[in-house]
Amino acid sequence: MTAKKLKVGETGIIKEINFDNRIQYRRMMDLGFIPNEEITCCNKTFGSTAFEVKGTKYGIRNEDAINILLK
């Protein structure tokens, strides 16, 4: 399952993040999107989704959210 498939209010645990671009991968890791971290879907809009990680909310493009795999 990917982070994009979470519904508003649902929580998941990050299994891994898969980005071909090394810079994008590092950026997500720096924001706290790391394996075994809890992620909550806060809001969905056309083209992006808001997630909460470690108490901070981030707007992530849906095309990036499909690269965040959950347990």
Regions found by a protein language model. Give the residues of each.
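Short, structured beta-strand/loop micro-motifs enriched in basic residues and often containing a Trp
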Residues: 11-24
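Short, conserved secondary-structure segments in the cores of folded domains
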Residues: 2, 27-30, 48
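Absolute protein N-terminus
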Residues: 1-2, 71
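Short alpha-helix capping/helix-loop boundary micro-motifs
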Residues: 23-27, 44
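Conserved hydrophobic positions within beta-strands
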Residues: 14, 39-41
